């Protein structure tokens, strides 16, 4: 049992464990928010165990949800120092969480897929760039790339990345994904993108289908 981050777990439908998929929820949600995506992903990854942890902090806006980092900005729109520090702290916890899942399951992180939504996408990309062990693929919905860690994980330069975004998102504008692709390309990462027409801040059926098609091609 992983004690670093608590959340939901769903066993592989085949009973044969070869891959790990970890979902990272958005701001103010919890691990149960995304675990239902395992129904779609398990059709192409029948040997995958699915994890969906709660973020480490209770949401600053109240309620029962969690956050990977606080949404605090300076007057110029940049993240304040506390937010940056909390991002780095969450990344450290996630890396420890991944390491513990490796130990618990005997499955190498080279067979791990990280899937994020909104703030979860942002923290997944930060984790990818800081991780010193291989990750197979990243799928990010409705997020962006903050580059707080200011690192480049050379071992993960060939990690497959797909970023999906709604073209009518007024919470995290789709320009955030376009900028993420540009900045990740500059750092040496190749990024696939897909934009869902008429979609606001969410995950559409066509976006989900695109992500499963993307993962199926990888033949993990």
Predicted features by range, described:
Residues 116-120, 124:
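Gly/Ala-rich beta-loop-alpha elbow adjacent to hydrolase catalytic centers
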């Amino acid at each position: 049992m992983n004690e670093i981050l608590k959340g939901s777990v769903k066993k592989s439908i085949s009973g044969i464990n070869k891959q790990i998929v970890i979902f990272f929820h958005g701001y103010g949600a919890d691990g149960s928010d995304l675990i239902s995506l395992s129904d779609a992903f398990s059709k192409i990854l029948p040997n995958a165990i699915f994890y969906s942890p709660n973020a480490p902090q209770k949401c600053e806006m109240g309620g029962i949800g969690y956050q990977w980092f606080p949404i605090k900005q300076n007057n110029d729109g940049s993240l304040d120092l506390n937010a940056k520090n909390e991002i780095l702290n969450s990344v450290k916890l996630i890396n420890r969480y991944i390491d513990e899942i490796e130990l618990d399951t005997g499955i190498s992180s080279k067979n791990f897929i990280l899937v994020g939504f909104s703030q979860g996408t942002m923290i997944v990309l930060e984790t990818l760039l800081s991780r010193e062990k291989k990750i197979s693929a990243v799928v990010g919905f409705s997020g962006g790339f903050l580059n707080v860690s200011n690192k480049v994980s050379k071992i993960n330069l060939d990690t497959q990345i797909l970023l999906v975004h709604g073209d009518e998102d007024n919470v995290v504008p789709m320009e955030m994904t376009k900028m993420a692709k540009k900045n990740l390309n500059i750092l040496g990462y190749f990024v696939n993108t897909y934009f869902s027409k008429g979609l606001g801040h969410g995950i559409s059926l066509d976006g989900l289908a695109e992500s499963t098609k993307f993962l199926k091609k990888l033949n993990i």
